[in-house]
């Protein structure tokens, strides 16, 4: 509801929310090759922003929606992927303890088209277990806080966070100075 709150506070301008889905390692390529663009906010403004994006991203699906929905999409994606990383790390621990080849398990599980290959490598692309960076830790903890504020017990998200702290004890996200995830 941040965008709605800002629109109520600053009535002389229209504020929209356009979540970015960029990885830190490939942000330029990710931006150039977006597979969808989501714009949330008041209608006249979202139409104007959609028209601006359409000039550059002629084949990319562009979705206009309410700002709360657009904000929620960002949290859904990041928290789902964080959950997938934590699940993969826990399953890797189980495989290691049972003397099972985790990579073969993943290879054969991916024959099931319902399971996508992203975020299943452990260690991940940074050579470490779990998730770090600025987005997943920040967004997961923000959603835990929000869920608690609206009376929902975020037990699954708590489990995701505990597993990440277990497999990534160095907490590298805390070293990211000047980013919201590292600030009190």
Give the label of every model feature segment:
Residues 1:
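ADP-ribose/adenylate-binding Rossmann-like module
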Residues 7-18, 23-118, 146-153:
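Internal alpha-helical scaffold of NAD(P)-dependent oxidoreductase catalytic cores
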Residues 51, 96-184:
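NAD(P)-dependent Rossmann-like dehydrogenase/reductase catalytic/cofactor-binding core
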């Amino acid at each position: 509801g941040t965008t709605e709150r800002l629109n109520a506070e600053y009535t002389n301008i229209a504020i929209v929310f356009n979540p970015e889905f960029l990885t830190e390692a490939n942000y330029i390529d990710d931006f150039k090759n977006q597979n969808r663009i989501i714009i949330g906010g008041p209608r006249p403004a979202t139409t104007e922003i959609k028209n601006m994006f359409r000039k550059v991203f002629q084949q990319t699906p562009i979705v206009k929606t309410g700002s709360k929905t657009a904000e929620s999409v960002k949290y859904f994606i990041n928290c789902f992927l964080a959950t997938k990383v934590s699940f993969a790390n826990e399953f890797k621990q189980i495989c290691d303890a049972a003397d099972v080849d985790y990579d073969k398990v993943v290879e054969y599980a991916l024959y099931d088209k319902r399971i996508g290959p992203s975020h299943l490598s452990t260690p991940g692309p940074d050579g470490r277990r779990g998730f770090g960076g600025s987005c997943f830790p920040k967004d997961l903890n923000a959603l835990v806080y929000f869920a608690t504020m609206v009376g929902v017990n975020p037990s699954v998200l708590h489990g995701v966070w505990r597993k990440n702290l277990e497999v990534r004890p160095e907490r590298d996200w805390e070293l990211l100075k000047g980013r919201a995830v590292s600030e009190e």
